[in-house]
């Protein structure tokens, strides 16, 4: 689901970037540890802040990333043009990832799957494209946060089949992931790292 105009502003500003750098990345690193090189995928890359973090903080050698919105793809490509072959950005859909099976050492979700109407399919696709033993790093917002009347009025999110944090983690284990670590935050969402069975 594409972001509305207000949510694009909220997700593509220095405050959101600082939140990713100083809260999300450190939490996910604590739960899942760094990568030892390898190729990572970011689903819903927006303007490309997550790509920087995956390379510089998590230690991926290369990042492939996609977004549903062509405008965000253009911004991310511009932001990372100097990185050459280390970054590839394209249009894509998390519920139908265009990659071969077992391609990635890690997949990153910085608050994207709650925008995906078929989020369960997206988890299945993430599992499919991860190598055995590969890790899925996710920061997600749960149903309770999205039910806030102000959020409901101003921002567009799928209304059907929303998840709470336990349900999100449960779907991961149902898809043959093992949880490396999880931290719920105030019942509004949280951080989870899960590994695909080897």
Describe each model-derived feature in a short phrase.
Residues 2-22:
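Class I SAM-dependent methyltransferase Rossmann-like catalytic core
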Residues 18, 137-193:
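C-terminal alpha-helical "lid/dimerization" subdomain adjacent to the S-adenosyl-L-methionine
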Residues 18-37:
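Conserved alpha-helix/loop element of class I SAM-dependent methyltransferases that forms part
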Residues 41, 47-96:
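Class I SAM-dependent methyltransferase SAM/SAH-binding core
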Residues 95-106:
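A short acidic, Gly/Pro-enriched loop at the edge of an enzyme's catalytic core
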Residues 106-117:
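A short SAM/SAH-binding and catalytic strip from SAM-dependent methyltransferases
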Residues 120-132:
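A short glycine-rich, Lys/Arg-flanked "PGG" loop and its adjoining helix->strand segment in the class I
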């Amino acid at each position: 689901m594409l972001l509305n105009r207000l949510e694009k502003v909220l997700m593509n500003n220095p405050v959101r970037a600082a939140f990713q750098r100083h809260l999300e990345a450190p939490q996910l690193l604590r739960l899942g540890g760094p990568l030892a090189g390898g190729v990572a995928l970011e689903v819903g890359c927006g303007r490309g802040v997550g790509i920087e973090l995956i390379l510089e903080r998590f230690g991926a050698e290369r990042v492939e990333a996609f977004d549903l919105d062509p405008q965000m793809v253009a911004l991310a490509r511009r932001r990372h043009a100097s990185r050459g072959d280390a970054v590839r950005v394209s249009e894509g859909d998390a519920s139908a990832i265009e990659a071969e099976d077992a391609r990635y050492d890690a997949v990153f979700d910085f608050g994207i799957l709650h925008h995906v109407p078929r989020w369960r399919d997206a988890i299945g696709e993430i599992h499919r494209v991860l190598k055995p033993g590969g890790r899925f790093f996710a920061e997600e917002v749960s149903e309770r946060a999205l039910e806030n009347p102000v959020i409901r009025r101003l921002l567009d999110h799928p209304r059907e089949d929303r998840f709470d944090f336990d349900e999100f983690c449960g779907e991961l284990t149902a898809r043959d992931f093992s949880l490396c670590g999880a931290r719920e935050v105030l019942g509004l969402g949280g951080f989870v790292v899960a590994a695909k069975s080897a």
